[in-house]
Swiss-Prot record:
The keyword Oxidoreductase does not apply. Belongs to the universal ribosomal protein uS10 family. SMART domains: Ribosomal_S10. Keywords: Ribonucleoprotein, Ribosomal protein. InterPro entries: Ribosomal_uS10, Ribosomal_uS10_CS, Ribosomal_uS10_dom, Ribosomal_uS10_dom_sf, Ribosomal_uS10_euk/arc. PROSITE patterns: RIBOSOMAL_S10. One of its GO terms (cellular component) is small ribosomal subunit. It comes from Methanosphaerula palustris (strain ATCC BAA-1556 / DSM 19958 / E1-9c). This is Small ribosomal subunit protein uS10. GO terms for biological process: translation. Involved in the binding of tRNA to the ribosomes.
Amino acid sequence: MQKARIRLTGTDFNKVEMVCDKIREIAERTGVNLAGPIPLPTKRLVVPIRKSPDGEGTATWDRWQMRVHKRLIDIDADERALRQLMRIQVPKDIGIEIVLES
């Protein structure tokens, strides 16, 4: 039987977990095997910016950061389960990637 590997990425931790919960509910309803969600390392993108625009004065810095949270889910590729997966309402700032493996 084929397996579907689902990779979720997003900057909002709560939205990523919400989509994981929806996938888990679909797996329980359809009775397919589910492995995960496996938390992958969170990527931190840090951008230091000087507060002073003209370069005069003391060097004080603002540090802006964006965190990218990732989850990995393996699920059996049952036709009924995959059709329901395609219908999930995913927020637009969450990336979802589905790869079928044999």
